[in-house]
Amino acid sequence: MTNNIIQYCPWIDCNVGCDFCFVHGQPDVDKVKSLQYILSLLKLPEAREADGFGLIGGEFFQNQLSSPSVKELFYELVDRILDMTVERNLPTFWIATSLIFKMDKELLPLLEHIQERQLLDRILLCTSWDSIYRFKSRRAEKLWECNVLRLHELYPELRIHVETVLTEHFMNLYLEGGYDKWEFEDRLGVRVDYLEPNTGFQGIKNFVDRVPNFLAKRATFLRFVREVVSTWPAQDKMDFLNPRIRSNVVYNIEDGEHHRIGDRHIIPIAQQPTNHRIKYGYSDSDRTMEDDYKLLRDSI
């Protein structure tokens, strides 16, 4: 499966403060100018030929829309993308959010706006759950869980997708019986996919010192594949760490500027022409999880 999806990042402003934040220390952009720029990108041929669109941050709904001009342009962007999904009968528009906040002020009004257009079934709300460094407390994690369940209650047609980073801590938790993909999905009514950890824009030594147990050991990942992933249905094995289920083009923010990251189904981000300085995967090997899994997938 190949998805010709384009993701746009309007800003990296975020209040959550994950210890492993992949854009830690990066300068942000002017929100109004950025939204105007992304609106102009929707006129390009690549947008007219895309199979779907996504908006990633940063966060959008934790006071980021407090400025009337920013809110107006953000709603215009959402409406323009919705128009394109209807015109071309595209099934999905991805919107990313942490859900670690009170939703009534900014997220729910946007969902009500989309519901009024009878297009809420096109939205895939993308959020994240991690076993370490994301939630500052059990109370924050409980807020996230309650928000997921509340969204299902308010908007049964809304789909929710969760991404979890394959950290050393998470894989050991799973291997020791403290987590189960199917129980988690059933309890919260979500689909879960998994991401390879990376250092973002931080040097690996400083990163490992700040967030130990985040980057995985290679032996832990290989054991996780043998003992966990090998038990999954065939489609889930195919989707695991498969770049082709993700966006192919991302307009990302680096050093305070937008950069187009293209052909992601073929060229990993770390090998893109912009200066990403990213370490993927392991704390003890130069290989990546994706490379290792390609070799293992057909044998499990």
Which residues make up each language-model segment?
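Radical SAM enzyme [4Fe-4S]-AdoMet core and its adjacent flexible, acidic
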Residues: 119-276, 280-286, 293
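N-terminal [4Fe-4S]-dependent radical SAM core
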Residues: 1-9, 25, 46-49, 287-299
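Cysteine-cluster motifs in flexible loop/terminal segments that predominantly coordinate metals
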Residues: 14-21, 274, 287-290, 294
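Distinct, well-ordered alpha-helical segments
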Residues: 67-78, 102-115, 138-140, 173-180
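Residue-level detector of alpha-helical secondary structure
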Residues: 39, 75-82, 86, 108-115, ...
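Core AdoMet radical
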Residues: 5, 25-33, 48-71, 84-104, ...
